[in-house]
């Protein structure tokens, strides 16, 4: 699984005040080159310093040492187009685990209070500057709760997309999981994964 190149502005974060009674401060990292995995991770942790490109590159090299044959090869593979193994290993360095969601299961059994956030891999339109091409590639996005509501923190969005409460979130997840080539990861603390307390049907 990989992410879609994006020729937009450089990655940047914004503290956005959204129109609510008590506007939450939301960290939303924007897309730069092929670094959507990095942006999704930082958006999950709501921290611009949670991970860097160098951190993910070190993890990638550790997981795939035999792929780093020459400096040219290293440059070609080190473009930030990271797969699920890098994301899972990165989360483990922070004491978290990525639980792969079986799409045959009902999202209604997810124990949302025990899940810090969600990372989704889904098809996204391929763009070149302002032009949208008739092609799609896989893209990493983050969804998480901030200030009592859930937001889509896709790094390609201009600002966080409000989803709503728990019922709206489940509808959002169901909608995307019905599509082709969509995968869902639950980001949970290690102890939650160990006891499988991310689910209510155990």
From Swiss-Prot:
GO biological process: cell motility; endocytosis; membrane biogenesis; membrane organization; protein deubiquitination; proteolysis
Post-translational modification: Monoubiquitinated. Ubiquitination activates deubiquitination activity in vitro.
UniProt domain Josephin: residue ranges: 23-202
Catalytic residues, chain numbering: 36 (nucleophile), 139 (proton acceptor)
Catalytic activity: Thiol-dependent hydrolysis of ester, thioester, amide, peptide and isopeptide bonds formed by the C-terminal Gly of ubiquitin (a 76-residue protein attached to proteins as an intracellular targeting signal)
Subcellular location field: Cell membrane; Cytoplasm
Keywords: Cell membrane, Cytoplasm, Hydrolase, Membrane, Phosphoprotein, Protease, Ubl conjugation, Ubl conjugation pathway
Transmembrane parts of this sequence: none
Main location: membrane
Gene Ontology CC annotations of this record: cytosol; membrane; plasma membrane
Modified residues (Phosphoserine): 15
EC top class named in words: hydrolase
EC number: 3.4.19.12
Cystine pairings recorded for this chain: none
SMART domains (UniProt xref): Josephin
GO molecular function: cysteine-type deubiquitinase activity
Protein origin, superkingdom: Eukaryota
Parts forming coiled coils: none
PANTHER family membership: JOSEPHIN 1, 2, JOSEPHIN-1
Subunit and partners: Interacts with beta-actin/ACTB.
Function: Deubiquitinates monoubiquitinated probes (in vitro). When ubiquitinated, cleaves 'Lys-63'-linked and 'Lys-48'-linked poly-ubiquitin chains (in vitro), hence may act as a deubiquitinating enzyme. May increase macropinocytosis and suppress clathrin- and caveolae-mediated endocytosis. May enhance membrane dynamics and cell motility independently of its catalytic activity.
Protein name from the UniProt record: Josephin-1
Organism: Homo sapiens (Human)
Species classification: Eukaryota, Metazoa, Chordata, Craniata, Vertebrata
